């Protein structure tokens, strides 16, 4: 079976974005926003050539090829994050007990969920903002992973254990992920 001697992926850098690469740490800046991430892999090299980021690996194995594509996707998400940002939308649903959802500090507090006396709490990751308007919860930020984790924390805080989710549909559910409707 022939073996590829070289695999390379290129990421185009937009005009209004600055990228710095030091020892496989990629720093992406634009308009006062900055994302920093370190990619540790022994065979993969990341460098900047003109207005492109080049990710390459010599004599790659299957996992090395996959990792090159993964790093490319992470860098694309970093560039999209500092230029556009990411937004997740969640909906508050209840049948009988009206929930009261509020933001205090770095937590989302869910009161009166299924008539419970003690509030449920969901952690907000650093660098993420949560806004509540009516039955909509909007989670925004520049780091896709932190925005997604915050939305998942909110959704998991209202999970009902031991009951059929087809019948008991109360909770807060993700309805749109980074521009894609679910």
Curated annotation (Swiss-Prot):
Q: What InterPro entries would the database entry show?
A: Ribosomal_uL6-like, Ribosomal_uL6-like_a/b-dom_sf, Ribosomal_uL6_a/b-dom, Ribosomal_uL6_arc, Ribosomal_uL6_CS2
Q: Which cysteine-cysteine pairs are annotated as disulfide bonds in the entry? A: none
Q: Which GO terms describe its biological process?
A: cytoplasmic translation
GO CC, one annotated term: cytosolic large ribosomal subunit
UniProt GO molecular function: rRNA binding; structural constituent of ribosome
The stretch of residues making up the signal peptide is none
Q: Is Ribosomal protein one of the keywords UniProt gives this record?
A: yes
PROSITE patterns registered for this protein in UniProt: RIBOSOMAL_L6_2 (PS00700)
Q: Does the UniProt entry include the keyword Isomerase?
A: no
- What are the UniProt keywords, alphabetically? Ribonucleoprotein, Ribosomal protein, RNA-binding, rRNA-binding
* Similarity comment: Belongs to the universal ribosomal protein uL6 family.
What assembly does the database describe for this protein? Part of the 50S ribosomal subunit.
For this protein, the record's NCBIfam families field holds:
PRK05518.1 (NF004037), uL6_arch (TIGR03653)
Q: What does this protein do?
A: This protein binds to the 23S rRNA, and is important in its secondary structure. It is located near the subunit interface in the base of the L7/L12 stalk, and near the tRNA binding site of the peptidyltransferase center.
Name it.
Large ribosomal subunit protein uL6
Organism of origin is Methanocaldococcus jannaschii (strain ATCC 43067 / DSM 2661 / JAL-1 / JCM 10045 / NBRC 100440)
């Amino acid at each position: 079976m022939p073996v590829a001697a070289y695999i390379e992926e290129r990421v185009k850098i937009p005009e209004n974005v600055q990228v710095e690469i030091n020892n496989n740490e990629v720093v992406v800046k634009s308009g006062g926003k900055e994302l920093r991430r370190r990619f540790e892999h022994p065979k993969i090299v990341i460098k900047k050539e003109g207005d492109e980021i080049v990710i390459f690996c010599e004599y790659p194995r299957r996992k090395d090829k996959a990792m090159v594509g993964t790093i490319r996707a992470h860098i694309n998400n970093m560039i999209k994050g500092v230029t556009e940002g990411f937004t997740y939308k969640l909906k508050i649903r209840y049948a009988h007990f009206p929930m009261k959802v509020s933001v205090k500090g770095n937590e989302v507090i869910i009161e009166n969920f299924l008539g419970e006396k003690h509030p449920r709490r969901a952690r907000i990751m650093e660098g993420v903002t949560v806004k509540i308007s009516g039955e909509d919860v909007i989670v925004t930020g520049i780091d896709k992973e932190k925005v997604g984790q915050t939305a998942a924390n909110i959704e998991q805080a209202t999970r009902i254990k031991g009951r059929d989710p087809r019948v008991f549909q109360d909770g807060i559910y993700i309805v749109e992920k980074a521009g894609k409707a679910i």
